[in-house]
């Protein structure tokens, strides 16, 4: 039998307070990162199953816990809500929630002083200034597994300041932006002794007006849409009584409780416009704080979530299985995917002398012909698959991927036998793998060592800031998606085949990476082997004038986006 929601919720809060207390016991430090990871998982899972119970932490301040604990709980809930509103996967969500839990680990005493408006001593000021470095040091006691979270903490203070600064300071890491946003909001909404805190909606409104950061603005809008107009735990005025709002049911009726009778709560379901006060308030009643969320009345609605990525993966599978590229067959398969059809109409423009888009699916197929259609259709579907896979660096990954695709298209543009859409399909599948399986490792860095590997070329993942990947898992996923594409095997083999044993098919991928290194990490000179491979392959690819190739490469206007 499942544990009662109230029990799970109370245990989560108790464990959060216990986690924060372990900082004072150095013998516990090695256990802190695994504990933070487990707590982050519990927050994510409970939020996905019982969002109202956790959202109520943003309005119900529990005096049984310290101010620091209430603050960390609020910030963890906001982080979980932000991740849910963006549809981030479990690994990414748990990393960000863990960073939120860890951020205040070393300054619990200082946070409580802030709440009481007690002046900081010099030692407090020093600890406060170094809080993120101290937290990172404690986490690294658990080993290298904590490195991703310490990298988030390293820039967190800078991001917090930049989110509310003018003039605009460019911020490039969406994950740190999300954590900083959750911090600013929680610091503003958590109840304090001076009663200077504000409601969540007021905090979001103020921040929306102040921040110049576009990603932060998008996060705020998504969070408001996700939470809705009323927060569980808010005090509302109904029938001339102050009641407590808990949830809204499938029929859009608000679930309220009245505490007018001290011996028994009275439950209401009403359809009305409510005047609410979502400002956090002290709640000492365990029934209101925890037990009401055991009720069937506040069960979250079972929403039918459409998994866009899964829908596209099924389309890829169906096209591959049926080998169906006739208009009649494709129109049936693609009918549920109007955006794919619209993108296909755009993708066929290079096959039109006037460079005009097609009018519809039938026109698209007639423009490109039966031979070219399969690769173009697959490319459009794979491109959309990457575009709908949520990640804070999704725009960057897409931009870098498009750069690699353009380079490959240019390399093979003089070859009449090989269609660039067919060759580049594995790149889209590779990018999708990175977004879904390496989401916590992705960064804007180009991780090619200054000291070249004498045996292997740098892997594709290094252009997306990922140092190493599970090659077995990568091979399995790419083969599953593109088993009928010979360039997939060539790409995978080129990542692991020693330089002495490379085939011509392998060397095409090596050439792509050499040119990409020139573009995205121009400060790193090519090795003699790279230069020789590039020269040989350009000739094979019918680029007899290298200056012509470089001139056309420059016209692509690729750049190393930060």
Residue ranges and their predicted role:
Residues 1-126, 137, 141-147, 491, ...:
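Generic N-terminal leader segments that precede the first folded domain
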Residues 15-22, 181-191, 312-319:
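Solvent-exposed, amphipathic alpha-helical segments
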Residues 31-34, 38-67, 192-208, 213-243, ...:
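Conserved alpha-helical "signature site"
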Residues 75-83, 135, 139, 181-185, ...:
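Buried hydrophobic packing segments
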Residues 252-259:
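Short, solvent-exposed secondary-structure boundary/capping segments
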Residues 260-298:
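Glycine- and charge-enriched low-complexity intrinsically disordered segments
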